[in-house]
UniProtKB/Swiss-Prot annotation:
It is found in: Cytoplasm, Cytosol; Secreted; Lysosome; Secreted, Extracellular exosome. The gene is IL1B. Belongs to the IL-1 family. GO terms for biological process: cellular response to lipopolysaccharide; cytokine-mediated signaling pathway; fever generation; immune response; positive regulation of cell division; positive regulation of immature T cell proliferation in thymus; positive regulation of T-helper 1 cell cytokine production; positive regulation of type II interferon production. This is Interleukin-1 beta. Monomer. In its precursor form, weakly interacts with full-length MEFV; the mature cytokine does not interact at all. Interacts with integrins ITGAV:ITGBV and ITGA5:ITGB1; integrin-binding is required for IL1B signaling. Interacts with cargo receptor TMED10; the interaction is direct and is required for the secretion of IL1B mature form. Interacts with HSP90AB1; the interaction facilitates cargo translocation into the ERGIC. Interacts with HSP90B1; the interaction facilitates cargo translocation into the ERGIC. It comes from Cervus elaphus (Red deer). Coiled coil: none annotated.
Length: 266
């Protein structure tokens, strides 16, 4: 009959000095001593739990020693230890791996879900000319009599998304109760102002196209509207009455770029 290998000798064949590095904090000498006196089964010594499993392999017994570092190390310490944030951080650092989180710019489909804030207002230039619709797509500056004030256009000014600038608020100017917005387009080489028809199911929205967006700047008791698409071009009126509102490149002189704004209650 073939001799059965001694359990201790078979166990030590699977033991390596490298294991001492893993349990150096608990004392490698104590670890070796515990292994030399193990019986078959499961043993718990101090802070370390040892389990021995049996497996039949090639018609001979082999013992596999698995060393499990138990969480009892914290609870069975010889001294009272309060579990601090650093302890939890150390535990989690072994479980989770830190990775950078990259934030991408939100697309318009998400921005459109955000409510667009707006106010109703009327605009008069510094010469007290009111803005009126002379035709469905033509906006003019006229001096109105008191009985004609009902002709004055009411704007729905929406606060929209754009690159931030000091003391400049990005807005879009739509005509209330109409699907029309002031927009800036180029005709030839010159930026021009027009009234553009839009889809009421889509507009207004937070991320308006640049042609619809103006920087509103407050100067004392007046405001200016500068095109975002064409910097230094402003919504303007001219001194002669009944001229269309246009996009002007000059401030002062014949071009009037400053307006008094009257905010209306909802």
């Amino acid at each position: 009959m073939a001799p059965v290998p001694e359990p201790i000798n078979e166990m030590m064949a699977y033991y390596s000095d490298e294991n001492e590095l893993l349990f150096e904090a608990d004392g490698p000498k104590q670890m070796k001593s515990c292994i030399q006196h193990l019986d078959l089964g499961s043993v718990e010594v101090g802070n370390i739990q040892l389990q021995i499993s049996h497996q039949l392999y090639n018609k001979s017994f082999r013992q596999v020693v698995s060393v499990i570092v138990a969480m009892e190390k914290l609870r069975n310490s010889a001294y009272a230890h309060v579990f601090h944030d650093d302890d939890l951080r150390n535990v989690l650092s072994f479980i989770f791996e830190e990775e950078p989180v990259i934030f991408e710019t939100s697309s318009d489909e998400f921005l459109c879900d955000a409510a667009v804030q707006s106010v109703n207002c009327k605009l008069q230039d510094r010469e007290q000319n009111s803005l009126v619709l002379a035709s469905p797509c033509v906006l003019k500056a006229l001096h109105l009599l008191s009985q004609e004030m009902s002709r004055e256009v009411v704007f729905c000014m929406s606060f929209v998304q754009a690159e931030e600038r000091d003391n400049k608020i990005p807005v879009a100017l739509g005509i209330r109760d109409k699907n029309q917005y002031l927009s800036c387009v180029k005709k030839g080489d010159t930026p021009t102002l027009q009234l553009e028809e839009v889809d009421p199911k889509v507009y207004p929205k937070r991320n308006m196209e640049k042609r619809f967006v103006f920087y509103k700047t407050e100067i004392k008791d007046t405001v200016e509207f500068e095109s975002v698409l064409y910097p230094n071009w402003y919504i303007s009126t001219s001194h002669p009455e009944e001229k269309p509102v246009f996009l002007g490149h000059f401030r002062g002189g014949q071009d009037i770029t400053d307006f008094r704004m009257e905010t209306l209650s909802p």
